[in-house]
């Protein structure tokens, strides 16, 4: 319990945000069900004609879903979980501020729910317009409680926004410029700026409403020289950016999902970034399009009509960039991809109807009609991020897969700093592909470390662990459960453990050039346990496997390794083939002979496909899909199996 109350770990706090959002979603859904039951048939149904109660339920539903479900989930939950991982930061810039920004939300939700039970409840709608929210219409304490709830929620969001902005600007990995940030990080960054600029205006508006109700001021009371339209201007100066606060994190999520399941980088990265910034800036300049029906003068309506239509330009850039990302890609129609495609379709419809409503004269005619509600609902992004996880493996399978990945493309390093102290690193380098980046981010979120993209040497993504606590907590226990099976990694691990437990610099310089000297004497390491070897082999193929469609029409799979004859022999036996090639070539760096298993028969390659499809998690999976699609015989043989998956 103490861990969760006092935690300053970004992932713990992200988990708390997500749990809180699910709890709030259940409350909000319960209110929604009551509304739908009442509207299910003409006339009075369940609320006995109590219109105030109906308005209270509407208000509570809106506040709960906006301030306690969508914002905590998308910004607090996914933001805390993914932003530090994506920029290579160990945590957020202000961990304790992160903690308090979450723990302000439960009392805020309690205050909001309490407002529904004080006297007749707050039946003002989520806009809380005066004079309906004034003393004459709501004389009890319900609206005051709702205002205090919004204050707490707003403070929470502003603290979180400051934290995100500082983290993104100051805690990126060396070499990660702003133009290399993942799009989801940009989305959270833009959202944080919008929160920081818009929430103080809302706070001022509802504070003036509070003083009108309790301290005899008349900011919004015409009898004292006030104007209720002032409240509408202040509220919608917050309210329209709030729409983008809800949708922009969804933009970032959809960009990653579309990229990952298309097997391509996002089309027009810079255009996507500047489109998000443009949407954020323009969002502050169009607030009065929510107020066409209150009697604005014609010049004001003309300006807001033009400004609102301009927002369609950056929005269109984003939609066409998503479509261009899909075009020509190797599409995998998974659950998150279906959500993303549904979002693009609905968002396009919502955006087009929004352009029509931007026209002030049409908006007045269509005001309070279902057309307007449909516009907003169609712009809502869906729950694809909840379903998007590159790995469908159990933790036991993932452990073996990660060790296989390290055996293939990883290295355990012991280095010195200025001949004084020893440094310890785990490094895994893969090709610079979006799905490899996503896969390594997920692995890093479980086992620790940082992931970053490097542009030199043709580009690659790299997962590094260099923190002794992380080694002690996750990496070394992983190797004790799942032994590496290549002689290279076996000797690296032995060398690593000698100095990890006793960092003797003099002994290090004495032994560092001889750690591979006994490689010939290493006994066969492959694990005979079929389940472990099968899962380990998935990670090893992700690193070292090769799928080739030959110009003659045939298809083959091959995997090679320096020195480890017995390991390659075990792979050959696992796939039930008899052919093992001993190449005359020697490894460029190691100088050891190269052993290779090559499988070209239809039955053998089909066996490999059946084994690899559930296990591969990165770019090799895309290669395998293309490999199958280019071969008619493989496509025919594996069709039923792939459909089942």
UniProtKB/Swiss-Prot annotation:
GO molecular function: cytochrome-c oxidase activity; endonuclease activity; heme binding
One annotated Gene Ontology cellular component of this protein: mitochondrion
Region (COX1 exons 1 to 8 encoded) residue spans: 1-368
Top EC group: hydrolase
Keywords (A to Z) from UniProt: Endonuclease, Hydrolase, Intron homing, Membrane, Mitochondrion, Nuclease, Transmembrane, Transmembrane helix
Protein EC: 3.1.-.-
Superkingdom per UniProt: Eukaryota
TM helices/strands, residue ranges: 15-35, 56-76, 99-119, 145-165, 183-203, 234-254, 266-286, 304-324, 337-357
Membrane association type: Multi-pass membrane protein
Localization terms from the record: Mitochondrion; Membrane
UniProt PTM: The mature protein may arise from proteolytic cleavage of an in-frame translation of COX1 exons 1 to 8 plus intron 8, containing the aI8 open reading frame.
Disulfide topology: none
Region called COX1 intron 8 encoded, residue ranges: 369-645
Main location (coarse class): mitochondrion
Cross-referenced InterPro entries: Cyt_c_oxase-like_su1_dom, Cyt_c_oxase-like_su1_sf, Cyt_C_Oxase_1, Cyt_c_Oxase_su1_BS, Cyt_c_oxase_su1_dom, Homing_endonucl, LAGLIDADG_dom
Family to which this protein belongs: In the C-terminal section; belongs to the LAGLIDADG endonuclease family. In the N-terminal section; belongs to the heme-copper respiratory oxidase family.
Functional description taken from the UniProt entry: Mitochondrial DNA endonuclease involved in intron homing.
Protein name, as recorded: Probable intron-encoded endonuclease aI8
């Amino acid at each position: 319990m103490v861990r969760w109350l006092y935690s300053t770990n970004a992932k713990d706090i992200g988990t708390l945000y997500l749990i809180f959002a699910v709890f709030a979603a259940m409350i909000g859904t319960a209110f929604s069900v009551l509304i739908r039951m009442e509207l299910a048939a003409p006339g009075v149904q369940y609320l006995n004609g109590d219109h105030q109660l109906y308005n209270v339920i509407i208000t509570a539903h809106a506040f709960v879903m906006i301030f306690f479900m969508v914002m905590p989930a998308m910004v607090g939950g996914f933001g805390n979980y993914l932003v530090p991982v994506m920029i290579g930061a160990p945590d957020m810039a202000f961990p304790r501020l992160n903690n308090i920004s979450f723990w302000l939300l439960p009392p805020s939700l309690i205050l909001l729910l309490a407002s529904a039970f004080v006297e007749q409840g707050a039946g003002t709608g989520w806009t809380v317009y005066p004079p309906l929210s004034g003393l004459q219409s709501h004389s009890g304490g319900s609206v005051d409680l709702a205002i205090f709830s919004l204050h707490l929620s707003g403070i929470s969001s502003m603290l979180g926004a400051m934290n995100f902005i500082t983290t993104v600007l100051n805690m990126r990995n060396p070499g990660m410029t702003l133009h290399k940030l993942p799009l989801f990080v940009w989305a959270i960054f833009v959202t944080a700026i919008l929160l920081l600029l818009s929430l103080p205006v809302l706070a001022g508006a509802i504070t003036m409403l509070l003083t009108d109700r309790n301290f005899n001021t008349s900011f919004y009371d015409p009898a004292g020289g006030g104007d209720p339209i002032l409240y509408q201007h202040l509220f919608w100066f917050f309210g329209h950016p709030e729409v983008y606060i809800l949708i922009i994190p969804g933009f970032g999520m959809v960009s990653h999902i579309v990229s990952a399941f298309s097997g391509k980088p996002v089309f027009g990265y810079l255009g996507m970034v500047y489109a998000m910034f443009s949407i954020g800036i323009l969002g502050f300049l169009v607030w009065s399009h929510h107020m066409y029906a209150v009697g604005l003068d014609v010049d004001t309506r003309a300006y807001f009509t033009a400004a609102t239509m301009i927002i369609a330009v950056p929005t269109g850039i984003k939609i066409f960039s998503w479509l261009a990302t899909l075009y020509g890609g190797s599409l995998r129609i998974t659950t998150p991809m279906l959500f993303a495609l549904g979002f693009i379709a609905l968002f396009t419809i919502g955006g087009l109807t929004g352009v029509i409503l931007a026209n002030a004269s049409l908006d007045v005619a269509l005001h309070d009609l279902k057309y307007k509600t449909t516009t907003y609902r169609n712009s809502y992004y869906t729950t694809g991020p909840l379903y998007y996880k590159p790995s469908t493996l159990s933790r036991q399978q993932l452990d073996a897969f990660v060790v296989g990945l390290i055996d293939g493309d990883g290295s355990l390093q012991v280095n010195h700093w200025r001949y004084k102290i020893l440094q310890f690193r785990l490094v895994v380098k893969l090709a610079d592909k979006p799905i490899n980046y996503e896969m390594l981010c997920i692995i890093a979120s479980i086992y620790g470390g940082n992931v970053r993209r490097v542009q030199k040497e043709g580009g690659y993504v790299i997962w590094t662990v260099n923190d002794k606590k992380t080694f002690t907590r996750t990496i070394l226990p992983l190797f004790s459960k799942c032994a590496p099976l290549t002689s290279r990694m076996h000797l690296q691990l032995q060398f690593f453990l000698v100095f990890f437990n006793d960092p003797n610099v003099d002994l290090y310089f004495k032994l560092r050039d001889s750690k591979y000297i006994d490689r010939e004497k290493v006994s066969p390491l492959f694990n005979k346990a079929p389940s472990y070897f099968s899962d380990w082999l998935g990670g090893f193929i992700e690193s070292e496997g090769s799928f080739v469609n030959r110009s003659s029409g045939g298809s083959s799979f091959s995997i090679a390794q320096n020195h480890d004859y017995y390991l390659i022999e075990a792979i050959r036996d696992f796939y039930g083939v008899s052919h093992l090639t001993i190449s005359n070539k020697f490894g460029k760096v190691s100088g050891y002979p190269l052993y290779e298993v090559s499988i070209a028969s239809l039955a053998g390659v089909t066996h490999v496909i059946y084994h690899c499809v559930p296990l591969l998690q990165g770019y090799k999976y895309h290669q395998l899909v293309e490999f199958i699609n280019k071969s008619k015989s493989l496509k025919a043989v594996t069709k039923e199996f792939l459909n089942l998956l």
